[in-house]
């Protein structure tokens, strides 16, 4: 349940660098501001449960699962692992050894950013009550 969950809020301690990298990937791949994904649907933002409300929310669910899988390999912490990538709008390229922690995390973020850019954004799914809609 990471999808942009810790990005950009005011008056909070500095956040893990890879979340800043994820924010930058989102900006590279699409036109929507990253903050639009912070509290969207059942899976974008902190936590995640229930059935995704739409295609965009499924992107966040997939990203959560991708991070979960990355953590299963060695001592990989996707929330703190930085990585190398290039952005040539709207193209993103992950660098580093395939199968490494950094590359796996980068691939998760890249796939999510591309998915976000391709999915329709439904404003009515922003800020929904997760307790009632995400069971």
Curated annotation (Swiss-Prot):
InterPro entries: PLipase_A2 (IPR001211), PLipase_A2_Asp_AS (IPR033112), PLipase_A2_dom (IPR016090), PLipase_A2_dom_sf (IPR036444), PLipase_A2_His_AS (IPR033113). It is found in: Secreted. Its main location: secreted. It comes from the Eukaryota. Binds 1 Ca(2+) ion. One of its GO terms (cellular component) is extracellular region. Belongs to the phospholipase A2 family. Group I subfamily. D49 sub-subfamily. This is Basic phospholipase A2 10. It comes from Bungarus fasciatus (Banded krait). The lineage of its organism: Eukaryota, Metazoa, Chordata, Craniata, Vertebrata.
């Amino acid at each position: 349940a990471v999808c942009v969950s810790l990005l950009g809020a005011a008056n909070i301690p500095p956040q893990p660098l890879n979340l800043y990298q994820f924010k930058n990937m989102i900006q590279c791949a699409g036109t929507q501001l990253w903050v639009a994904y912070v509290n969207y649907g059942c899976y974008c933002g902190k936590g995640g449960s229930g059935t995704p409300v739409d295609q965009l929310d499924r992107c966040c669910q997939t990203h959560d699962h991708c991070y979960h899988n990355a953590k299963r390999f060695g001592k990989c912490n996707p929330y703190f692992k930085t990585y190398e990538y290039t952005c040539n709008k709207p193209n993103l390229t992950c660098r580093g050894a395939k199968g490494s922690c950094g590359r796996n995390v980068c691939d998760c973020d890249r796939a999510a950013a591309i998915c976000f850019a391709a999915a329709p954004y439904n404003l009515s799914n922003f800020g929904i009550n997760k307790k009632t809609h995400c069971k």
